[in-house]
Amino acid sequence: RRSIYTTYFHNSRLLVSVGQRVQRGQPIALAGSTGRATNDHLHFEVHAAPTDSLPAIIGDDRYPPFTTNPELWIEPLPGTGIVAGRVWDSQGRPVRQARVYGLVKPEPQETPFSFAETYGERTRGTPAYQEHFAVSDVPAGEYVVGVTIEGQKVFRRIRVEPGKLTWVEFRP
């Protein structure tokens, strides 16, 4: 059993109290640039923890031990889906920080999307998927996605459907 916790950083103002129940779509805070931030934005984290101990979840080294990719926890924008998957080397090990090319995301326009990157040492896949990467808000359509593994380019053809998750795996 896992407890799911979310954290929201850089808020200019909180609109709810700690422990208050909220409804889907209810604003809980206003984005800001508090803390170590250079512009207004929301830093959102999802923690899938085997404990409900807040000190164990947050951690003391600024890298919470149960952080997962929040893109798999948020409903995609209308007309878009989610692409998630795994990238393996020839020995069956995850390839860390590999760039997965070929996907597009129309938002945000001010910071164009160019590639997904597989997780590094400190990021974990979600408990349900154990994915190595995930990208939300990908417009529905056909894509050829690719990654380089051990110097070899590997491609896969995928179809993204609105509101659904598309799974893809890469091996040399």
Go through the PLM ranges and name each one:
Residues 23-35:
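Short hydrophobic beta/alpha edge segments that flank linear recognition/processing sites
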Residues 139-151:
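A short, solvent-exposed beta-strand micro-motif common in secreted/extracellular proteins
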Residues 1-5, 37, 62:
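Gly/Ser-enriched beta-turn/beta-hairpin loop segments
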Residues 8, 135-136, 158, 170:
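Hydrophobic core positions of the immunoglobulin-like beta-sandwich fold
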Residues 149-172:
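Structured interaction patches on ligand/partner-binding surfaces of diverse proteins
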Residues 2-25:
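Short histidine-centered loop motifs in beta-beta connectors
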